[in-house]
């Protein structure tokens, strides 16, 4: 049994090279990771809230949503740490229908996993 390649998928190294995190974003991530770890270890009394849409399938809407969470985070930072949950697939029992951004970044076009990986990376930056 063999596989037929429909399209080549970029490697993680290629994606990271083409779409690296900025120095400022890296610094923010390290700081947030430390805050989260301190909550999990009981060293920080704030609550973690992991929140987000059931499924992220619109890049612009998701970026607007996360920007709103960021504004809210600044208001509740003494009590809460808000963590956006960004789930980019849509579970399907039968395997039929729209499967989410990973498989089909534009719901009105055909599947394109390569473009889906890029769209998801963009959203997570």
Model regions and ranges:
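Generic N-terminal targeting/processing segments that precede catalytic cores or assembly contacts
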Residues: 28-46, 61-74
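A generic, well-ordered mixed alpha/beta core segment in the N-terminal half of proteins
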Residues: 67-125
């Amino acid at each position: 049994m063999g596989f037929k390649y429909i399209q080549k998928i970029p490697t993680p190294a290629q994606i990271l090279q083409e779409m690296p995190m900025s120095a400022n974003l890296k610094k923010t991530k390290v700081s947030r990771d430390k805050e989260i770890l301190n909550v999990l270890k009981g060293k920080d009394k704030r609550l973690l809230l992991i929140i987000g849409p059931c499924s992220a399938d619109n890049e612009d809407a998701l970026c607007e949503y996360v920007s709103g969470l960021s504004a809210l985070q600044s208001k509740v930072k003494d009590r809460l740490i808000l963590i956006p949950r960004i789930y980019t697939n849509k579970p399907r029992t039968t395997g039929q229908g729209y499967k989410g951004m990973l498989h089909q970044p534009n719901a009105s076009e055909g599947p394109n996993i390569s473009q889906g990986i890029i769209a998801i990376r963009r959203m997570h930056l």
